[in-house]
Amino acid sequence: IPLSYGFEAWTGLEYTAATGMIYEGMSQEANDVITDVRNRYDGYKRNPFNEEECGNHYARAMASWSAIVALSGFHYSGVTHEFTITSAPGNYFWSNGHSWGNATVSSNKVTIVVHYGKLSVQTITLNNGKELKLKKMMTIAENNSSEFTIN
């Protein structure tokens, strides 16, 4: 008896497992899993824009976004206005539901760019424990940036 999608992997669960691996320090293994999923949907054997599980455009594959959050170490509290990001040098995407942008981390500097919306910050924390508490909350407006030195 042919079963629709009977031989398809559940990509959403693969992304979830990969994200867990990132949080456990297994970044290379996680990258291997994500690469395997993306290779499966290469446009030759499967549609690269439709990771089918239980029908077309099934939402569970959206779990892939959780890997971005895990790799960047991003967390934002709208209550305390704390912006947390990885201490690893690089350029990282962030999004908090009301605004989005990127943060560039280099040694002891963090530059936060807001591409859409506005972002209120009181504390900037790196995931290595270093943080900068501002004397007063500041708001970074859309299409603006602020650079912070964290010692």
Model-derived regions: residue spans:
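Non-catalytic C-terminal accessory modules of carbohydrate-active enzymes
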Residues: L3, F7, E14-N144
